[in-house]
Amino acid sequence: MKRKSVVLITIVLGIALFLTGCGSKSTSSEDPLADGVLTAGTNDMYLPLEFRDENNELVGFDIDLGKALAEQLGVKIQWVPTAWDGIFNGLNAKQYDIVLSGTSITEERLTGFNMTDPYLANGIVIVSRKDATPAKTPKDLAGKTVGVQIETTADYAAEALKTQENVEYTVNKYDAMLDAFAALEGKQIDNIMTDISVAQFYTTLKPDVYAVSSDVLSNEPIGITVRKADTAFNEQLNTALDALRENGKLTELSMKWFGQDVTQNIDTNLKVIE
């Protein structure tokens, strides 16, 4: 092989190795926290768990939890805002260590990832406008248009319930719940399916506009997602969460953002509509 060709191949291989490292977090250890930083992927449009305030700063229950978690672990936290429909691909690509973004624990997700013990009780509800006939059950959605956030458990539930309940309605899918609630207020859609924590936040924000009109339809508590191989790291996170639960920090954050404590005695018997 000519020397010129060897040099060219060496350069090409060097570029390939450089590009492989771009966009991923790497450390000299298998411990994701070896660099002293906990990186967290989050969808910053999911009020009140993670969103931007008037100063464009990240705020919300999960944001406060992430800070407390990092402090408990003795590291710094770095947020990586990510679109929800690509957030798990980013985790597998090692663009961050965890997904901390209001993620429901489901059997399907547990086949591809590890998830911590739940830190927040959660289930799906139907939201109606105050000036309309309330949809108390999926059957009441017949002939209506329902808004959901794309690729969420509410999205899957809205599609599955059409078959399970033998009812026909249209599902409009939004990139952010903020857009779905704006569409509901503007009468572009008739109802919303979403997590109860999100629904209660919006109904508290605008009690004359929105109302939670159904019972909780599912049980899908929220946890932190890590890569399947990071079993020891997952247990490390569980230990930190236990400490925050025992010292009252989780309760404090829950009262701040939800006005009630939804972090204790969480039902872990999954009931996911899919």
What residue spans do the PLM features occupy?
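Periplasmic-binding protein-like
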Residues: D44, A121-S128, I196, Q200-T239, ...
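Extended ligand-binding regions for polar small-molecule ligands
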Residues: G23-K25, I63-Q72, A132, K139, ...
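Extracytoplasmic small-molecule ligand-binding "clamshell" domains
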Residues: T27-G102, Q236
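C-terminal motif of bacterial Sec signal peptides marking the signal peptidase cleavage site
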Residues: F18-G21
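A ligand-binding cleft/hinge motif common to bilobed small-molecule-binding domains
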Residues: G86-N89, T103-G112, A157-A160, A183-G186, ...
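Short helix-initiation/N-cap motifs at beta->coil->alpha
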Residues: Q78-N89, T133, V171-A183, E220
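Flexible hinge/capping segments at coil-to-helix
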Residues: S29-D31, R129-V146
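Ligand-binding clefts/hinges and TM-proximal coupling segments of bilobed small-molecule sensing domains
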Residues: S24-S28, T153-V171, A211-V212, D242-E274
